[in-house]
Amino acid sequence: MRVAVIGGGPSGSCAAEILAKAGIKTWLFERKLDNAKPCGGAIPLCMVEEFDLPESIIDRKVRHMRMISPSNREVDISLDRVYGKSDNEFIGMCRREVMDAFMRNRASDLGATLINGLVTSIDTCLLYTSPSPRDS
């Protein structure tokens, strides 16, 4: 089996890592390897553990934040209200280009081939190895 994973963000990199670890020939395509994606970069603690991310990529541990929408609606988030005062729970803030590169490199280290390029179309073919039940 051979698999092409299109997009080297967290989901694509994670998929490529799992496939490569299973011994499946994997290509991971990403159009911008140095992309500084304009997103908040907030990662809940459970996802830091789930993705097995090292603390070195976390720039800041946040317990309180205010999110402001483009229409200026504000939402305050406080982990103290949910978990009480504890340093064990936090939201990790990181730069996406750092996290994405870490995850892509980990997939590559496990055997995935990283390709810097834009995928605009995919040609596929059908291969029949046995007659279908309709042909009987």
Residue ranges and their predicted role:
Residues 2-24:
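N-terminal Rossmann-like FAD-binding beta1-loop-alpha1 element of flavoenzymes
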Residues 116-126:
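A conserved short coil-to-beta-strand element within the FAD-binding core of flavoproteins
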Residues 17, 21, 49, 105, ...:
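Short, well-ordered alpha-helices that flank and scaffold nucleotide-derived cofactor binding pockets
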Residues 32-52:
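Conserved N-terminal glycine-rich FAD pyrophosphate-binding loop of Rossmann-like flavoproteins
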Residues 20-38:
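Glycine-rich FAD pyrophosphate-binding loop
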Residues 48-102:
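A conserved beta-strand/loop capping segment in the N-terminal third of enzymes
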Residues 128-135:
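Conserved small/polar residues in nucleotide/adenosyl-binding loops
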